[in-house]
Amino acid sequence: MAVAAAAMIGLPQAYLEGKEVKETSSLVTELCRHFYTQGWVSGTGGSITMKVHDASIPKPEQLIVMSPSGVQKERMQPEDMYILSANGSIISTPSPKPYPNKPPKCTDCAPLFMKAYEMRNAGAVIHSHGMESCLVTMLNPQAKEFRITHMEMIKGIQGHGYYDELVVPIIENTAYENELTDSLTKAIEAYPKATAVLVRNHGVYIWGDSWIHAKTQAECYHYLFDAAIKLHQLGLDAATPDHGPIRRTIHSQIKDSQYEREWPRRWIVLDIEGTTTPITFVTDVLFPYARENVGKHLNLTYHTAETQEDIKLLRAQVEEDLREGVTGAVPIPHADEGKEKVIAAMVSNVEAMIRADRKITALKELQGHIWRTGFECDELKAIVFEDVADALEKWHSSGIKVYIYSSGSRLAQKLLFGNTDYGDLRKYISGFFDTTIGNKKESRSYKEIKETLGVDDPAEIMFVTDVYQEAVAAKAAGLEAIISIRPGNAPLPENHGFKTVTSFSQI
């Protein structure tokens, strides 16, 4: 069977018996034994799969090694492994073993593993039945997500840092493993940043670019699940920055001269410019700093991966601008024309974009990297209105989760709130949204925020901004929109119909 199957996919039998496949099979065996000692694959449960790394074969076309089903994971041998083609077809089956061993069977997780390979270009996938991965889904039987923030091991999860909120989708268990395929697929689609999916009362699927990434993340996820369980036992909330007491129901009073009502507010989303921070700080301090230092920044960091990515993003934006006839856009030469020419064109485009106050991701990412240097060197200190720090602390202590939504990059937002004249305010903020989630003047962006937060009723989210068009978009998405009136803000249309505040103390 193995010879025929190998021939069908254009591989010689010798390859299936070669070094790469043998080493991968041995590694899967070794990891299964290790994870058995962790309690992740006991009682024949759980499973591991891994791509056969071969630099001569593109990753999507590499063979796959999968552990068998119903086998004592701590006693497995390399010859017990199944070998699959890149599309999931079995091309090598292990030989049967004498009684009391069961006939060989590929893991029931195979269809779910294939989804991680196909949809996330994974290099390895781990399915754990660790007790903490089961219990964490029971803390709130109605929850569709697991959330945790401000915990050290979050940094071990791809794309996350200490201040980020880690969100893992939870899907409902079924009687048979392969029946989870559709719900796992939907979860992977709905949570593009996630590298894991929890199955209620069952376990967790975790993937990574390689076996090292998958293993590292699995260890971090289990640590975080355990931390959340222990915090819950202490009556503390893992999803808030200071892990304060769990609050089951939160009610706040909104009062003004026109109405008074009780509103179960749990989420507040804040704009920055003209809402938490004076417009003049952005226009008179941040923008000039970026404009004056862009050339210096590009010269010093030109060969770094980060700056090369910034150049790539800006070049793509400029090409689009040139097609649309945007004023100030000039072509950015290819790298082989020399560093100096590339930087000169970059500077010219950045200056034009800043003058036009363009709200585009390519510019905002580069600005964030320039501002990072300014904050690190104490050349910049962020300014917030005097009522902001007290309000953030009050909302946080009340169990209300505060998020930021700004056209500035997430990095720039974190730098600003981490370096204010009132100290580091990030401890009061649960997360940050930027234009990668959508344009602030489009209602679908606010719908995406609602889905990301896992909120059923959008009216439970209050959005505060100084921009009328943003308030209109948020309201169209069902959010409670309030307009911030601050010194220097643009005038509002007459009869705009929105509640306004001049201070966060009025919220």
Swiss-Prot record:
Residues 2-237 are annotated as: Methylthioribulose-1-phosphate dehydratase. It catalyses: 5-(methylsulfanyl)-D-ribulose 1-phosphate = 5-methylsulfanyl-2,3-dioxopentyl phosphate + H2O; 5-methylsulfanyl-2,3-dioxopentyl phosphate + H2O = 1,2-dihydroxy-5-(methylsulfanyl)pent-1-en-3-one + phosphate. The modification N-acetylalanine is found at A2. Binds 1 zinc ion per subunit. Binds 1 Mg(2+) ion per subunit. The active site is at E152. GO terms for molecular function: acireductone synthase activity; magnesium ion binding; methylthioribulose 1-phosphate dehydratase activity; zinc ion binding. Keywords: Acetylation, Amino-acid biosynthesis, Hydrolase, Lyase, Magnesium, Metal-binding, Methionine biosynthesis, Multifunctional enzyme, Zinc. The keyword Acetylation applies. Mg(2+) binds at D271, E273, D466. Pathway: Amino-acid biosynthesis; L-methionine biosynthesis via salvage pathway; L-methionine from S-methyl-5-thio-alpha-D-ribose 1-phosphate: step 2/6; Amino-acid biosynthesis; L-methionine biosynthesis via salvage pathway; L-methionine from S-methyl-5-thio-alpha-D-ribose 1-phosphate: step 3/6; Amino-acid biosynthesis; L-methionine biosynthesis via salvage pathway; L-methionine from S-methyl-5-thio-alpha-D-ribose 1-phosphate: step 4/6. Its EC number is 4.2.1.109, 3.1.3.77. Substrate 1 binds at C109. Residues 268-507 are annotated as: Enolase-phosphatase E1. One of its GO terms (cellular component) is plastid. In the N-terminal section; belongs to the aldolase class II family. MtnB subfamily. In the C-terminal section; belongs to the HAD-like hydrolase superfamily. MasA/MtnC family. This is Probable bifunctional methylthioribulose-1-phosphate dehydratase/enolase-phosphatase E1.
